[in-house]
Curated annotation (Swiss-Prot):
Mg(2+) binds at D580, D584. The system is composed of three essential subunits: KdpA, KdpB and KdpC. Belongs to the cation transport ATPase (P-type) (TC 3.A.3) family. Type IA subfamily. The chain crosses the membrane at residues 80-100, 108-128, 265-285, 310-330, 650-670, 678-698, 724-744. The gene is kdpB. Its EC number is 7.2.2.6. CDD domains: P-type_ATPase_K (cd02078). NCBIfam families: ATPase_P-type, kdpB. GO terms for molecular function: ATP binding; ATP hydrolysis activity; magnesium ion binding; P-type potassium transmembrane transporter activity. ATP binds at D400, E404, F435, S436, A437, Q438, T439, R440, M441, S442, K457. This is Potassium-transporting ATPase ATP-binding subunit. HAMAP family: KdpB. It catalyses: K(+)(out) + ATP + H2O = K(+)(in) + ADP + phosphate + H(+). PANTHER family: POTASSIUM-TRANSPORTING ATPASE ATP-BINDING SUBUNIT.
Length: 744
């Protein structure tokens, strides 16, 4: 039976809203009310933070200050390799003080020069790490600026929106029901349980385009600190104070408790082992040198033992200080690059795992497709024009607030076929017929001109029964169109006007633009893509073919996804998955790399180890590239660091033992001016190379979609050979400069 909705009903308000041709986007353009902390310095926005250049003053100045703060023993002890340099700096400083007091083992100026450059080496490593952390700190500051003190409108009874109780947002608890109207800030994380609204999430995502949040489905999550631009929603708070998504984001990007990843730990163990071996070897050189001097003295040859200052310089130049000084910065920069991609990762482990992914599982709904069935075309019945069908479908959908109903209205307008006089329609006081499980139809009763119309849309069998009752007939051509749409994986809706069948509206899951090309890139990387959906095999096969995935699993239940992930992991594969629905949460929790969409449900975001603020599942390709880039950068700089130690051998070994074993002068292939200049040149080069490699460590080695073997060969040629050859001209140029200036 038809219902005349009361004026206060949201459906009628929405229809009037549409008939007045007022779009949500117009509300988005209106100025929004904001609440800020009194006297607070406005932080950089999320978009401004991502646009900061690597060496922007906003990052460099704090990094220099932080580099001095990191000179504490506790901070230095976190990096064993640089801690050795730190101890060496202190030791040479003490030796310089002793030299000033007449207890010199070497000229005071030489000891001071070595000490200063050792301190520079430590500071340069600190600057690299501080620069990597700087962007994260700026992001955290911008997120803190979002947190505002607002008054929430708490509903004691969700059915009575006119009775609200003001309460501070900080006092909201999980389970509270709040009303959020146009212009209001969302007081806390929640799930929309009623209504639909346009929401500005730019404060968090950096994207100015508003998004739609509605009850039901996978787009029901709202985040505290965002702003409702139009309409209203009722939301259930899902997080207690201090546990919100914004709070967790701040904690993540600050990285105060950043743990080293497995690969980083393994590399640290390798570097520490090399450092210990070289430390023991260097320590034994002093007694060996003293013994050699005594032996040569007995033979009538005058020589002097190696000094502690030179031994410290030798040790620092031989241990892998380059990668040791940049290792932490590489890890932090990987997290920072992920943040620049608008992805929040819970840990470096997740970023690193992204670089080793073998299998990618994709939930169809909202990931490969837009997530809602959308009207794609009108198929008129014999004797009916597309215009007549579009007008009937448009009228029947005016009060339909489902995504499908809205898409029908949109398609009719896009085609320019909905030419009904909207003013006359509003004056006619139409009666809207809501959808019900019993009738499986919805529509409108309206008088247009002198004729009364009962326009309905719904399932084919429901419309067939309705038309038959009105003494109409259901054309065979329409039945064939219904079967054809279903066979292709779409959903057919039949539209009727009184006793006449007007035609079919085809609803289908629309595959996202550009998704096929992105899957081709994944395939080139060696990553297998698998689409998982609860649809039947026919629908799944159609969408899989259109999207270009490698494989698909149809009629899958949530436990099917979980079982497939465990099966792939049991075969030694790393599995990545994107998802946005509550049904994705168990699989997201099991996956090695679990990227939840920010537009998705709260359960999905809590289960994942990454959150994509742009809610773009194709972002996973970029995430994989960032993960691979971090691994490649770490490996490349390790290769470079170890390789360039070879050149330092030829510079510092002959210089260190020049007075003990003059014969070692034959190894001075670079023809360095003096032993002192050789030592100083090696120490200075060792410090400066960290500075020159900071941009590479922060920006990362450029990733190319090549096989692992090809990438390894390429990087060995560039960074292995480059690390071997570069120190020779570098040390020689520094030596020539020192000699020309007369400083050695």
């Amino acid at each position: 039976m038809a219902l005349r909705y009361p004026e206060s009903d949201p459906v009628v308000r929405t229809v009037k809203h549409r008939l007045d041709s007022t779009d949500a986007a117009a509300h988005a353009a209106a100025p929004a009310r904001t609440t800020t902390h009194p006297g607070a310095h406005p932080p950089l926005s999320a978009k401004d933070v991502r646009r900061l250049s690597m060496f922007a003053p906003a990052l460099v100045r704090p990094a220099i200050v932080d580099s001095f703060r990191k000179l504490s023993p506790r901070a230095q002890a976190k990096n064993p390799v640089m801690f050795v340099v730190y101890i060496g700096s202190i030791l040479t400083t003490l030796l310089w003080v002793m030299a000033l007091r007449g207890q010199a083992e070497a000229p005071a100026g030489f000891i001071l020069a070595v000490s200063v450059w050792l301190w520079f080496t430590v500071l340069f490593a600190n600057v690299a790490e501080a620069l990597a952390e700087g962007r994260s700190k700026q992001q955290a500051a911008s997120l803190r600026g979002i947190k505002t003190t607002v008054q929430a409108k708490v509903l004691a009874d969700p059915q009575r929106r006119d009775r609200v109780q003001p309460r501070a947002a900080t006092a909201l608890r999980r389970g509270d029901i709040v009303l959020i109207e146009a212009g209001d800030m969302v007081p806390g994380d929640g799930e929309v349980i009623e209504g639909v609204a346009s929401v500005d999430e730019s404060a968090i995502t950096g994207e100015s385009a508003p998004v739609i949040r509605e009850s039901g489905g996978d787009f029901s999550s709202v985040t505290g600190g965002t702003r409702v631009l139009s309409d209203w929603i009722v939301a259930r708070i899902t997080a207690n104070p201090g546990e919100s998504f914004l709070d967790r984001m701040i904690s993540m990007v600050e990285g105060a408790k950043r743990q080293k990843t497995p690969n980083e730990l393994a590399l640290t163990i390798l570097l520490v082992s090399l450092t210990i071996i070289l430390l023991l070897a260097t320590v034994t050189l002093l007694p060996y040198s003293i013994f050699s001097v005594e032996v040569m003295k007995a033979a009538g040859v005058t020589s002097s033992p190696i000094t502690i200052t030179v031994l410290v310089a030798l040790l620092v130049c031989l241990i892998p200080t380059t990668i040791g000084g940049l290792l932490s910065a590489i890890g932090v920069a990987g997290m920072s690059r992920m943040m620049q991609a608008n992805v929040i990762a819970t840990s470096g482990r997740a970023v690193e795992a992204a670089g080793d992914v073998d299998v990618l599982l994709l939930d169809k709904t909202g990931t490969i497709t837009h997530g809602n069935r959308q009207a794609s075309r009108f198929i008129p019945a014999p004797g009916v024009t597309v215009k007549a069908l579009a007008e009937a479908a448009w009228l029947s959908s005016l009060a339909d607030e489902t995504p499908e109903g809205r898409s029908i209205v949109t398609l009719a307008r896009q085609l320019g076929e909905a030419a009904v006089d909207e003013a006359a329609l509003a004056r006619s006081q139409p009666v809207f017929v809501p959808f019900s499980a019993q009738t499986r139809m919805s529509g409108i009763n309206v008088a247009l001109g002198d004729a009364a119309h009962q326009i309905r849309k719904g399932a084919a069998d429901a419309i067939r029964t309705h038309v038959t009752v009105l003494a109409g007939r259901f054309p065979e051509a329409v039945l064939a169109a219904v079967e054809d749409v279903a066979r292709k994986g779409g959903t057919p809706l039949v539209v009727s006007d009184n006793d006449r069948v007007m035609g079919v509206v085809e609803l289908k899951d629309i595959v996202k633009a550009g998704i096929r090309e992105r899957f081709a890139e994944l395939r080139q990387m060696g990553i297998k893509t698998v689409m998982i959906t609860g649809d039947n095999r026919l629908t799944a096969a159609s969408i899989a073919a259109e999207a270009g995935v490698d494989d698909f699993i149809a009629e899958a239940a949530p436990e099917t996804k979980l079982a497939l992930i465990r099966e792939q992991q049991a075969q030694g594969r790393l599995v990545a998955m994107t998802g946005d629905g509550t049904n994705d949460a168990p699989a997201l929790a099991q996956a090695d790399v679990a990227v939840a969409m920010n537009s998705g449900t709260q359960a999905a975001k809590e289960a994942g180890n990454m959150v994509d603020l742009d809610s773009s599942p194709t972002k996973l390709i970029q995430i994989v590239e960032i993960g691979k880039q971090m691994l490649m950068t770490r490996g490349s700089l390790t290769t470079f660091s170890i390789a360039n130690d070879v050149a330092k051998y030829f510079a510092i070994i002959p210089a260190a033992f020049a007075t003990t074993y003059p014969q070692l002068a034959a190894l001075n292939v670079m023809r360095l001016a003096t032993p002192a200049s050789a030592v100083m040149s090696a120490v200075i080069f060792n410090a400066l190379i960290i500075v020159f490699l900071i941009p590479l460590a922060l920006k990362g080695v450029k990733y190319r979609p090549l096989g692992a073997a090809a990438l390894l060969r390429r990087n060995l040629w560039i960074y292995g050979l480059g690390g071997l050859l570069l120190p020779f001209p570098g040390i020689k140029l520094i030596d020539m400069f020192l000699a020309a200036m007369g400083w050695v």
